[in-house]
Amino acid sequence: MITNEALMVLENELTFSSEVERNYDDQFAVTGAKIGATLNVRKPGRFIGTTGPALNVEDFNETSVPVTLSTQFHVDTQFTSQDLALSLDMFSDRVLKPAVAAIANKIDFDGLTMAKNNTANIVGTAGTPPTGLITYLTAGAYLDSEGAPRDGRRSCIVEPFTGATIVDSLKGLFVPSDKISSQYTKGMMGRDSAGMNWKMDQNVVAQTFGSYATATLACATTTATGFISTGWASTSTIALTATTATAGLKQGDVITIAGVFAVNPQNRQAYGSNRLRNFVVTAPVTVATTGTTSVTVSPAVITGGQFQNVSLASTSASAVVTPFNNTGTVSPQNIVMHKNAFTLACADLELPDGVHFAGRASDKELGLSMRVVRQYTINNDSIPTRVDVLYGWAPLYPELACRVAA
């Protein structure tokens, strides 16, 4: 009963994690399973199509995203048999909720860190919270252009100060009275506003952008090192050069390359007014002023085939690389996303033998699993208890998300 109650508390405490795709697998609880096992989440194939009567068979290329269940997080506490005599509601409030809240915040924080480091599209101004709805609508436009459906599963996750800024900015505008009432009474954006569900999460992660304002970056799109002409990959390792000064790129920094335009995944045409494709740096690297430096970015630069995501209007031996920010600004990275952008996978942990109590609760619909293990200490009538979860995060369709810098 206590284990099931703990699982329900966890579901209620999750914020960011409640808005993403969640997967649960019970195969890892078998004897011999090891922490670090990997799930491969399949992604649907994509086709180009042919005009005219002639047959043109395309290969079926189904891709997958590995989700490594590498994080076992737990909260350890103890209570007495007298505590167990309390009603379940009292026990939940005094013991379970504080313990599970720590687990929920850890899961959310890890998820938001993963989202920040894997989301390339970005809007806003680093260091300044957005004051207009246009910033969030532009983020939504990126989702539209990348093929995200408007199916009621879009969400906007904001940190407290960003949320306070936008609510204050919109308080006098023409908004349905029920939305105004909700904003006034709760101090938050209405749940279903501007085409997305708004949620506040204090675990939104800040990006400290690299500081290299005096450096000029370039990429030789003529040689196109790391560019992929067909097929699929999640990242590309491209070659950058720096002049004037070295450039210390940080994980999570965003860059664009002149002449490399983003395309819609279905019609493969540049969207918007020929917007440049955003790329996120996946690992810290310093671009030297001599020679070229390999920089790994996401998404991969795919110029043709079924998974084409860029078009090259022209090439250059020194295409200008423009950073979103290069002044070392610290900026909370709020997230506008579709539910399928990221995935959280949970798995069962084995139940140990020789203990006072070992229980596990899991729910495939919720995509969650939790284990509670208790031992009895006869000397002082105490019951040491640990609550464990095993989970992993991965970007499923990171192009269906957009960071909102604040």
What are these regions (language model features)?
Residues Y24, F28, G32, G45, ...:
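Solvent-exposed, flexible loop/coil residues
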Residues M1-V65:
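N-terminal "assembly arms/tails" that initiate or stabilize quaternary assembly
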Residues T50-L55, F79, Y397-P398:
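Short, glycine/acidic-enriched capping/hinge loops at junctions between secondary-structure elements
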Residues D89-S92, L96-A406:
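Core alpha/beta structural scaffold of self-assembling particle/tube/pore-forming proteins
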Residues M1-M8, V41, G45, S64-M114, ...:
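Mobile, glycine-rich extracellular loop/lid and propeptide segments
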Residues G32-I35, R42-G45, G49, Q82-L84, ...:
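Noncatalytic linker/hinge segments flanking ATPase motor cores
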